[in-house]
Amino acid sequence: MQDLTGKHIVLGLTGGIACYKSAELCRLLIKAGATVQVVMTEAAAQFITPVTMQALSGRPVYTSQWDAREPNTMPHINLSREADAIVLAPCSADFAARLAQGRTDELLSLMCLARPMDRVPLLIAPAMNREMWAHPATQRNLQQVAADGATMLGVGSGWQACGETGDGRMLEPAQLLEDITAFFSPKVLAGQQVLVTAGPTFEALDPIRGITNHSSGKMGFAIARAAREAGAEVTLIAGPVHLPTPRGVRRIDVLSALEMLDAAQREAQHASVFVATAAVADWRPASHSEQKIKKDGSGHPPVLHFVENPDILATVAKSERARDGQLFCVGFAAESENLIAHAKAKRERKGIPLLVGNIGPLTFGQDDNSLLLVDADGVRELPRAPKLQLARELIAEVAARRSQGGL
């Protein structure tokens, strides 16, 4: 899946140890379909060689304004006019100061100042020591650069090359790729608040064991990412899964169906879209043993009693906000047979405008899927594809229905 096909990215490197991450970022951008032109400052070349970046980008690297390859000796004009975006990764504290002051003493800063601001965005991934990051001068400079139209991609936190720990690390290449992809995505849900549930629930029998299912949460996490790419403010309620939180998404971890219900009802009060992908346990033990249930040697298994869990989707769909059209509800049905019939019946039973069906055993834990969109007008299939691609298609469908008033 090439998310950046047709995009031409100027990747600018400034002086800092985080330049080693720029090599991987370059590779990921190209893998995502972009063409990459690397421009380096003299200081950046002390940390990683132009030869390395040329090998990865497949293009000659520019390091000087006086590059003889440009017939008009204006690489700052030529390169910026070809770009769909300039990405500074890493951007040092010194380079941020130059940008804030409009100083142009080498090629990369010249390009940033000479770029057509209405069509060539500037994306900045700062990287520096924690004290440099926290210094008022640095924060003042970055605020000025943002006020001048640049987009800040933020920083990471953790161990730094100097041996200290704190904020100021350059984001990881995969995180930057996610942010860059989101930047170019159509903002069809701008201003919307999207609530997503994902993963399984776990219903405890005792402190050791419980009832759960094979849901990996991948589809729900992909939907949360796609909604964020589309410009929404996203809250993700996740059952017990081991997946990284999508960039820019607020995550609430829960364990049981009752915990998920409580979180969903609370968060749905502020949402405009609710996508219920979680595979919630239908039943839970009527009682929970405080100690491990052990074999007693009789050969007879323990007698377990169950009670039905509340229906989270149906409960939210019956809320006043959902009934009066403020909240658009989308449900998921993971079935093992008769998918269309079960999906149609489930949509009507839960009283929702759109239900997405799939065959659970064929999708749990997989990176791809196929979906059926079921509404009052019938059924439409989304053929098998990566889950993120399907998530983007689903989010586009939801956005279209909202814009048409299809609540």
Describe each region flagged by the PLM.
Residues 1-124, 129-407:
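A cross-family phosphate/adenosyl-ligand binding-site feature
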